[in-house]
C-alpha cells in the first residue's frame, strides 16, 4: 500500500520534476570534489551518502555547504554532463542551489528531512519563483 503526502512550500527555482529521493541529513555541496562532474557520484567521505549517485534524483538536504564554486558545479552536472539531480528540496535554498536551472523548493509546511526518506518518489510542482510550490511524496509500505 502506498502512502501519499503533499507539502506546500516556496519555489526558489521554477519547474516540474520527479524522481527518487536521496536525503542527506548533512549540509550538501555541489563542487567537483563533493559530487563528481562526469558521474554524479558523491565523493564526500564524511557524508553517509558517499558513493551514491545524484543523477535523476530529487536531492533533499538542510542547506548548501561550500563556496559559490558549487553553483558552477551544479550547473555543469545538470546542464552539461547530465548527471545532476532533477530537483532540490531544502530547509533553506541558497543561491548556489538555483544555479542548476532545476526546480528548487524551501519554506515547506513541515521539515523535509523528517517527511521525506531516501527511496520515496517525489514530485515537485514549482511553476513560479517566489510563489507556492507543492511537493508530493509517495512512499511504498
Give residue ranges: language-model regions.
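Feature captures the catalytic cores and cofactor-binding loops of soluble hydro-lyases/lyases
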Residues: 2-17, 21-134
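Secondary-structure transition/turn motif
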Residues: 136-141
